[in-house]
Amino acid sequence: MKIDAGLDTGAVYAMRTVPMDDDVTLEELRARLVEVACTLLVDELAHGLAGLPEPEPQRGQPTIAEKISREDLHLDWSRTAVELKRVVRLGHAWTTFRGKRLTVLEAAVAAEESRTDGRRPGALAGTLVATGGGSLELRRVQPESRSPMSADEWLRGVRAGDGERLGTD
């Protein structure tokens, strides 16, 4: 990008499209973008020895995203499973269980809702959590002051009762 006075307004020397699926996390996307950017930079510098191409003006308006706060990463179980999965994909999503912080590292929207039907948001049914719309399946978690582990390992360790709720503390 050519340096310009405005924020993200300079003309572009080169760009690449990076495909992204619905399950990619922020960390995975960051790693993929670094790899693509490094390759693009090396390729363009090699071409630059013969003279840089004329930069093309950017299309459209820049998108400005607000900074993500700690509260934005708090899992509000009254939201839908799809919305909560998006928060988990950002990384460092958290809730509480028995007064302690529980970071949710990996989760999926559950195909099976019957085990959580009629339960209050945050209620556990094994690795499934009832939400405001659908169920979220916990896959990997990190309890406060502990190492990451599978949700099954965590549930065995805390001996969570069926229907016990997350996020009530």
Predicted regions and their residues:
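Internal anion-binding site segments
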Residues: 59-169
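Donor/substrate-binding cores of folate-linked one-carbon enzymes
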Residues: 1-64
